[in-house]
């Protein structure tokens, strides 16, 4: 292996075992694919386990753990045991446990892959909502490209242990840098994933023939529905009440066609 893992300005690969344990205990929390809850402990005790490891009593961590259990939708479940909960509810406990630890970094290793599709979507939406509020560093590992495109601010694609491409997800989808990435993204529903901000013309000058206003974060799929399929339309692109661009429907249609590596954007 090679490379560095920089955290707070330090390469953690240089840490000894004791320092790694301290970092893991105080600076990083984890959400596991198989939940990893203690079956003989209540939901509340599982959520507060990081505090207990540090020698704090249930009385001291109960309020913090309850706050995060409530936040992830588990109000009134603190006295239940993991076996009494569904898979989705157990993973909510796992997220509450990570949040109760109050670490700056949350590592989520295939955290939602064991859940059925509907619950998985709910958990993805919950994570997006929490991240918008908390602004933590979340490292999310997944084999599901749709999930990665939905959740990631910065996407890193690996093959055989090496980084093949990394960038903002929209950029990777529009600009695959080699045949592997091109094949990797070929089956993605581009209209559902791509956002207006990725295909708009950046300008604060309104078009002369404006058909309406759209938000910079709207999906192309939603714009197609609004336009009724009229490829001659132009829209003002707004962000927080201010124009940030113009969307030409012809550019939207062009973005739906996958680009091969090396092709320049028009």
Where on the chain are the PLM-derived regions?
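Conserved ABC ATPase "signature" region
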Residues: 8-11, 48, 52, 59-77, ...
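Conserved ABC ATPase signature
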Residues: 19, 81-85, 89
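Conserved signature/switch motifs of ABC ATPase nucleotide-binding domains
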Residues: 25, 80-83, 101
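Short coil-to-helix segment of the ABC ATPase nucleotide-binding domain corresponding to the Q-loop/switch region
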Residues: 41-48
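Conserved ABC ATPase "signature" C-loop
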Residues: 160-162
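ABC ATPase "signature
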Residues: 166-167, 175, 246
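The conserved cystathionine-beta-synthase
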Residues: 207-242, 247-266
């Amino acid at each position: 292996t090679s490379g560095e893992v920089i955290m707070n300005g330090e390469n953690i690969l240089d840490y000894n075992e004791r320092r790694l344990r301290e970092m893991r205990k105080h600076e990083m929390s984890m959400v596991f694919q198989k939940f990893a809850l203690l079956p003989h402990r209540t939901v509340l005790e599982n959520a507060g386990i990081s505090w207990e490891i540090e020698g704090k009593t249930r009385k001291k961590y109960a309020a913090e753990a309850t706050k995060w259990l409530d936040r992830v939708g588990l109000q009134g479940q603190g006295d239940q045991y993991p076996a009494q909960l569904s898979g989705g509810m157990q993973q909510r406990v796992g997220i509450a446990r990570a949040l109760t630890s109050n670490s700056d970094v949350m590592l989520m290793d295939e955290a939602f892959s064991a859940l059925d599709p509907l619950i998985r979507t709910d958990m993805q939406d919950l994570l997006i909502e929490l991240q918008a509020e908390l602004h933590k560093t979340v490292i999310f590992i997944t084999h599901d490209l749709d999930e990665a495109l939905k959740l990631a601010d910065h996407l890193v694609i690996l093959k055989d242990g090496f980084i093949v491409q990394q960038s903002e997800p929209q950029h990777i989808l529009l600009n695959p840098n080699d045949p592997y990435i091109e094949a990797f993204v070929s089956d993605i529903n581009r209209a559902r994933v791509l956002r207006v901000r990725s295909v708009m013309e950046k300008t604060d000058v309104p078009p002369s023939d404006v058909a309406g206003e759209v938000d910079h974060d709207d999906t192309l799929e939603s714009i197609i529905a609004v336009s009724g399929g009229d490829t001659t339309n132009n829209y003002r692109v707004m962000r927080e009440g201010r124009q940030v661009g113009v969307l030409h429907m012809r550019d939207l249609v062009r973005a739906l066609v996958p680009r091969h590596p090396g092709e320049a954007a028009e």
